[in-house]
Amino acid sequence: MRKWGRFLTPDPIAKVAADWAITSKSDSFLDVAVGEGVFLIHAARRLKELGASIQNISNQLYGAEISRPSYNVARQRLLELEGVTTENLYNGDFFNVVAERNASAPRSKTIQLIPAVRAALGNPPFIRYSMISGATRRRALNRVAEAGIKLKGPVDASVLFLIHTSSLVDDSGRLAIVVPERVLFTDYGSLARSHLREKFRSVRLVLCNGWSFSQASERVVLVLAANSGNRVFSIERMDFDSGISPGTASPKQVQELGSREAWRDLWIRTKLDPQGHEQFKQAITNPNLHTLQEFAKISIGCVTGANRYFVINKEVMSHYSLPRLYFRRAVAQAKQINGLFFTNEDWLQLFRSNENCLLLRIDEGHPAKPSRQIKAYLDRGRRLGIRSGYKLSHRAKWYKVPVTKTPDVFFTYMSHQFPRLVINNTMAVNLNSIHSLDLTIGDKIAFCTAFYNSLTMLSCELTGRIYSGGVLKIEPGELKEIPIVEPSELGLAGDLARVTPIVDGRLSRGDLEGVLDVIDPIVLGRGLGFNDAEINALRASYLKMRQVRIE
């Protein structure tokens, strides 16, 4: 299943989706990614409950499944569990399925025409745009264009599924689709959100408490969209383990979402209790706050396309007798940077500990002909098929990794305990698992020290997305908006300089609460003028959110 980015849907969510989407015994139904048939089975049961006959159900069910083994399993399970056989299941690419009402243009022989359905359900593959290639990508982009949407760049595959699915639903239909949280609760998810608002009168985004895909690396949302009822857009939480269905629960907040700011405020309301939300709203309006982008140019690190090959340790370098000339010092993982500073001694410790911290770099600054050992290593890469990788196949020379300049500061892209802003006191570069920051501010140490306050850390929790294991992921565009102070303009540089060694030591030990004990009174108290009660409230909100994430 991982080949297709597919993770089997638990029964509780499939039942909730089917019961909500199917409201009449005559409703036609489409499963956009059949898998092993869990949505089909619950749809058949729902139609039976509403009085549909087996024969009618057979004619009302439609579905697409690209995997032949899964397709066969789904048909067998539908027959064994519900007594339903149907000829309306298509073993092929979902983007070949087109509604008859949209079929005026000439079509290829592979196109599967179906009537527009009353209900569309499913759990599309959790895959990135780069994993859709060739004819499948062309078909997906054609379907999106037919829906009247012009893409400005790569989007998540789930967005393509969501848009095409909406084109297969009739004018009074319903849609119940499982998508990764990242598709809707990020800035780059605005395309999906705006499309849902334009296509449907009512959209409910259900955060699935107590339920998830154990194999998947991220949290999910159930999208419930309908072309009936009041015009609303809501986010709500549901605890499926407690038997609560979206049909009976009240939204956390309901309102029209016309602006990015309104969307973000609604999202924050789902994360904080009412008092914490109000406190945060007031705090971030402080006139002495800035955003990180005002003082930093933020970019991703080096993209190798094959880290295991290009980023090695001293043992591999020794084994292949590779000259040190061809390697750059590198930071490959968040766990390699811990304190407020990353020093030459820190890198040497990584090297001595046999950590992957050497980046292969072959460029114009090297001899015209690589050494015999390097040529042998490149030949090994060819035999392993390294150059056929997605990123490498687009390079003029597959082995020439585009290396970014040495950054002033590292920021952990994927963080477990807490995000880290680390001053780079070496010539090391970083991979794209870590963000690069070039600061335009004079006192870099005070600036980075001030980062570790409860308000800024709470903003990181609210801005990022949570992946399995409680990992917090913050994209470069999201990092730009993080609120921070400029210490010099508030007269805090001296106070921060005095506590810098303490902060460095506590960060190295992972003692963030100890760091907040030192920084909050300086930054939030003396700098922003918050009283003790306000500081404690912000800190309590932050620690609660962090605890929920990492548990």
Predicted feature locations:
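Conserved acidic residues
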Residues: 27, 118, 408
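Short helix-terminating capping/connector loops at secondary-structure junctions
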Residues: 52-58, 83-85, 112-115, 171
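Short, solvent-exposed loop/turn segments at the edges of secondary structure
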Residues: 57, 200, 216-220, 355, ...
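Class I S-adenosyl-L-methionine
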Residues: 1-55, 59-80, 98-105, 124, ...
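Signature of N6-adenine DNA methyltransferases within the class I
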Residues: 2-3, 8-16, 33-41, 66-72, ...
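Glycine- and acidic
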Residues: 1-3, 29-30, 60-61, 145-149, ...
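Conserved SAM-binding strand-loop segment of SAM-dependent methyltransferases
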Residues: 85-94
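Polybasic, glycine- and aromatic-enriched phosphate-binding surface used to engage nucleic acids
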Residues: 275-493, 498-505
